[in-house]
From Swiss-Prot:
InterPro entries: G_ERA_dom, GTP-bd, GTPase_Era-like, KH_dom-like_a/b, KH_dom_type_2, KH_sf_prok-type, P-loop_NTPase, Small_GTP-bd. An essential GTPase that binds both GDP and GTP, with rapid nucleotide exchange. Plays a role in 16S rRNA processing and 30S ribosomal subunit biogenesis and possibly also in cell cycle regulation and energy metabolism. Residues 150-152 are annotated as: G5. Keywords: Cell membrane, Cytoplasm, GTP-binding, Membrane, Nucleotide-binding, Ribosome biogenesis, RNA-binding, rRNA-binding. GO terms for molecular function: GTP binding; GTPase activity; ribosomal small subunit binding; small ribosomal subunit rRNA binding. It comes from Thermoanaerobacter pseudethanolicus (strain ATCC 33223 / 39E). This is GTPase Era. Residues 202-280 form the KH type-2 domain. Residues 59-62 are annotated as: G3. The lineage of its organism: Bacteria, Bacillati, Bacillota, Clostridia, Thermoanaerobacterales. Its main location: cytoplasm.
Length: 302
C-alpha cells in the first residue's frame, strides 16, 4: 500500500466534543475547547503525520440556525467543508435522539458524495446498551461507511478511529512538511487560546460577544521571553466591566490562565499584556468580519 493523505472534517452539533477529539488525536492544543456552544469559529486544521500517512483535520463550527452575520459565516464554513474533504467524521453523543438539529446535519450529509464515519463520543458517560441503541437509531437515518464509539476525553478507541480514518483516505503525497501540526497563523492560535479562557471564566452571554485581536508577538533579544500584546473587544460597555472585573481581578485571571497555555505552546516564558475595548455591533459588521478572516465568497463554492 502506498502513502495515504487526505482531508477529514469533524462535524456535529455544538459541544459534542469535536475540538476535544482533534486535540486528543494530535496530542496538541490546537482547537479551542469549552462547554459553551459555538466555541469554534474558524476551520482549525490539525495535521497528523507519520511515515505511512498524513491526515489534515478540519474542525468546523457546530451547524445551527444563524442569528448574525458571524453565525452565517460559521454555517457557510461548515457546509463548504463537507464538499471539499475526503472524509467526514459525524460526531454525536450517546444519549441523543435524532432531533431537528441532527436531521438538519444529516440532510447536508446527503447532499455530498463524501464518505461518513459515525463517531459516538462520550461513551464513558452512559451504559453500553444506550450506545448501541443510539447507533441503531442513527444508522436508520443514513448509510455510514463505518461506526466508531469513543471517549475523546479519556482517549478511548482513538487509535481505532485513526485506523478507520486512514483506511478510507486516498493514496497520495504529503500536503505539509513533517513538523507541521496546523496551518493556522500564529496570531490566530494565540487569540483563540485567550478567547478560550474567557469562555471558561465569564458569564454565558459575554464570551460570544467578544473577539481577540493580537497586536504583536515579539521575542526579546536579550532574554528567552516572548512579549504578546492583545486586545479584547466586546459589544457592550457593561461587558467591558465584567471582563475586567473588580480591581482587574477577572482580566488578571484570564491572562494568567492564557499565559500558562501560551508558555506550554512556545516552550518558553511569556509576558502577556491584555487590553479591553468596546466595539458595538461587531458581529454584524461585514467589513470587520472580513478583516478578522470571517469572510466567505459564496459564489466560489456554489
Amino acid at each position: 500500500m502506498g502513502h495515504k493523505a487526505g482531508f477529514v472534517a469533524l462535524v456535529g452539533r455544538t459541544n459534542v466534543g469535536k475540538s476535544t477529539l482533534l486535540n486528543a488525536i494530535l496530542q496538541e492544543k490546537i482547537a479551542i475547547t469549552s462547554p459553551k456552544p459555538q466555541t469554534t469559529r474558524n476551520t482549525i486544521r490539525g495535521i497528523l503525520t507519520t511515515d505511512e500517512y498524513q491526515v489534515i483535520f478540519v474542525d468546523t463550527p457546530g451547524i445551527h440556525k444563524p442569528k448574525s452575520k458571524l453565525s452565517e459565516f460559521m454555517i457557510e464554513v461548515a457546509k463548504r467543508t463537507l464538499k471539499e474533504v475526503d472524509l467526514i467524521l459525524y460526531m454525536i453523543e450517546p444519549d441523543t435522539e435524532v432531533g431537528p438539529g441532527d436531521r438538519y446535519i444529516i440532510e447536508h450529509l446527503k447532499e455530498v458524495d463524501t464518505p461518513v464515519i459515525l463517531v459516538v463520543n462520550k461513551i464513558d458517560l452512559v451504559p453500553e446498551k444506550r450506545v448501541e441503541e443510539t447507533i441503531k437509531i442513527f444508522k436508520e437515518q443514513y448509510e455510514f461507511k463505518d461506526v466508531v464509539a469513543i471517549s475523546a476525553i479519556e482517549n478511548k478507541n482513538i487509535d481505532l478511529l485513526k485506523e478507520k480514518i486512514v483506511s478510507l483516505l486516498p493514496e497520495g503525497p504529503k500536503y505539509y512538511l513533517d513538523d507541521y501540526i496546523t496551518d493556522q497563523p500564529e496570531k490566530l492560535i494565540v487569540a483563540e487560546i485567550i478567547r478560550e479562557k474567557m469562555l471558561h471564566f465569564l458569564e454565558e452571554e459575554v464570551p460570544h460577544g467578544v473577539y481577540v485581536e493580537v497586536e504583536s508577538i515579539k521575542e526579546r533579544e536579550d532574554k528567552d521571553i516572548i512579549d504578546i500584546e492583545a486586545y479584547i473587544y466586546c459589544e457592550k460597555e457593561s461587558h467591558k466591566g465584567i471582563i475586567i472585573g473588580k480591581n482587574g481581578q477577572m482580566l488578571k485571571k484570564i491572562g494568567q490562565s492564557a499565559r500558562l497555555d501560551l508558555e506550554e505552546f512556545y516552550g518558553k516564558q511569556v509576558f502577556l499584556d491584555l487590553w479591553v475595548k468596546t466595539r458595538k455591533g461587531w458581529r454584524d459588521n461585514t467589513t470587520l468580519l472580513k478583516k478578522l478572516g470571517y469572510a466567505i465568497d459564496k459564489k466560489t463554492y456554489e
